[in-house]
Amino acid sequence: FLQNLMGINILSAGFMTGSTANLIALAFIFSMAGTKVYYTDWMFANLPVVLTAMFISWLIGPKLLFRLTNKEKQPAIKGGIDVLKKQLDAMGKFSALEKKGAVIFGIVVLMWVTDRFHFGLFGFEINAVMAAIIGGVIALLPRVGILKWNEADIPWHLMLFSAGAYAGGLALNDTGAATWAVQSLFKAINFDKHINFWVLYTVIIAVMMYSHFVFTSKTMRTIILIPFIIALAKELGINPLALALPAAFTIDWVIGLPISAKPNVILFTAGQYSVLDNLKYGFIISTIGIILLLIAGMTWFKFLGITP
């Protein structure tokens, strides 16, 4: 169950559509730093880090921290595979609605992956949010769609929260509050503006990574920290992308506590592990994630032109 928790959260970090908070972070980078990050930019940069982290977590978790006894390795349900096969067969073949759903999902993913080519092909760009909206509209169209309007459950409260959070983050930049906070911090701690880039990079990644132990909302972490990081980079004369994008890569690493994300809560209710187990495993893998992002920053991200 803990390995499922790692997989769900860490693998979602490999894609910018893994969470709304990722998109908000990219919107800050574009509006405050003027740098556009495309779907494939994020995927090519962070997916190798994520896959490496997953492999290491598989070695550390089941192989070292939570070794299974021979008895535990045996199937918990007698004939479990046969039961699953029967349930799968009972579902029958793909229905017309399921095929439509797969096609609509494929269209949305295609729009996401090809976002950098839209302007050249169509004269305008379909960003990740618009692609999702288009998919939703298609799903609700008569005959073509798979849902009726009265069946759609739109979480307006989440949309309003995300919009308000984004507006709040932009206000930090537009009012100069983020820059003022950075300058005040420099004066208060007598900060050396000539600090080594990699020292600063490591501190920022660590703060972003470990902050999920304090802030349970990914969106809240994003609107508090990403504008501050961009303002910090500007104040030091560093390309904001070099600090803000790697920091954004940590947003979905909410693996330390059962309350850190909805999937964590669902998995915890199965009663297969304790809060301490989750905390211990999450802290270890989070620390490994910081190390991996540091190594990637010095090698892979540098090759991609993200870090100097």
Descriptions of predicted regions:
Residues 10, 80-86, 135, 158-172, ...:
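Small-residue-rich segments of transmembrane alpha-helices in multi-pass membrane proteins
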Residues 149-183, 197-210:
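Core transmembrane alpha-helical segments of multi-pass membrane transporters/permeases
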Residues 124-136, 188-200, 241-257:
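Structural signature of hydrophobic alpha-helical transmembrane segments
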